[in-house]
A protein has these predicted regions:
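Rossmann-fold cofactor-recognition segment
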Residues: 46-59
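A short, exposed helix-loop element centered on a Lys and neighboring polar residues
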Residues: 113-114
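Substrate-binding pocket helix/loop in short-chain dehydrogenase/reductase
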Residues: 89-90, 97-102
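Catalytic loop of short-chain dehydrogenase/reductase
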Residues: 129-140
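Conserved glycine-rich Rossmann-like NAD(P)H-binding loop of the short-chain dehydrogenase/reductase
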Residues: 26-41
Length: 140
C-alpha cells in the first residue's frame, strides 16, 4: 500500500503545523492549506503540497481537495482546524458576525465531509477531525 495522506486545513501555524509535523514523522504525505504563506513554507520543508486559501471559501476548499487527490490519489486523514465563534456578549454579537462564524466553523466541515466521504468509502476508511477554538490567545 502507498503511504497514507493527511490533508490539513489550517496547517500553516500552531496546532495545524504541529499536527503536520507529527503526521510527517509517521510517514504520511501532506497537503496543507492556510490563508498565509506559512503553509507553503512548511509543506516545502516536509516534502508536501500546499495551497493558500481560506476554509470558508468553497472554491478554495475544493481546490486543495482536488489538488490532494490529483497529487496523491487518496486521502486518509483530514484535519480541519479553524478559528472560533465571535467573542463578546451574546446580545452584542450581530447576526452578520454569527453568519461569518458559521461560514468559517461549520460549513467547511460539511463541505469537506461531502467531498471526502465517497473517496474514503471507496478506500475502505479514513478519518476527519474538526477542531475549533474559543478565546484562545496563547497555549496554557
Amino acid at each position: 500500500m502507498s503511504k497514507k495522506v493527511c490533508l490539513i486545513i489550517g496547517g500553516g501555524r500552531g496546532m495545524g503545523a504541529a499536527t503536520a509535523r507529527q503526521m510527517h514523522s509517521r510517514k504520511y504525505k501532506l497537503a496543507l492549506m492556510s490563508p498565509s504563506t506559512s503553509c507553503e513554507t512548511l509543506a516545502a520543508e516536509l516534502g508536501g503540497i500546499a495551497l493558500r486559501g481560506r476554509a470558508e471559501n468553497k472554491g478554495e476548499l475544493k481546490a486543495i481537495f482536488d489538488l490532494t487527490m490529483l497529487t496523491y490519489g487518496r486521502i486518509d486523514s483530514i484535519l480541519i482546524h479553524v478559528g472560533g465563534p465571535p467573542k463578546g456578549d451574546l446580545l452584542d454579537i450581530s447576526e452578520e458576525d454569527w453568519d461569518k462564524a458559521n461560514d468559517m466553523v461549520l460549513k467547511p466541515v460539511i463541505r469537506m465531509a461531502k467531498l471526502a466521504t465517497p473517496v474514503m468509502e471507496k478506500q475502505g476508511g479514513g478519518s476527519i477531525v474538526n477542531i475549533t477554538t474559543f478565546s484562545a490567545f496563547e497555549p496554557s
